[in-house]
Amino acid sequence: MYDKQEVCCFIGHRRVGEKETLKLRIYSVTEKLINSGMHVFLFGDHSEFNDMCYEAVTELKSFYPQIVRVLYRKDYPKADAYTLQFYLDEFDDCICPDGVGYAGVAAYVERNRAMIAQSSVCVFYYDTDYRAISRRYVKNRIITRETKSGTKLAYDFA
């Protein structure tokens, strides 16, 4: 594994506002982290924030070749070399943390917790006004709608 003191993870909402301002800020913060000794960056998937962070880190990798980009995936825990190669075309390493691949609907939450546990620094994009996707749950023949933000859960965990 990696030395935790050199590891940073990115966690944020699926959709982001003020993209241009945020891109500049991500780039600036990431470069400061690199200059302070961070060189392993962990990414989740399925969010605009992660995509923006990946783009910034990838651009910075041309100036700082020691950067390692690691995808923390939530599925395919027993992926073979052929499947992993699809991930490794864009990332330097790919990890499915223990238990995450079988966590079902909690996979994102468990993946984020694993990323936080492996990192000494977490860069969050958390908007208190963000409206998470509402999901319908049926329990004991009672239908309820529940809105949970995985980013808020990760933020509270960190």
Which ranges hold each PLM region?
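Acidic/glycine-enriched connector segments
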Residues: 1-157
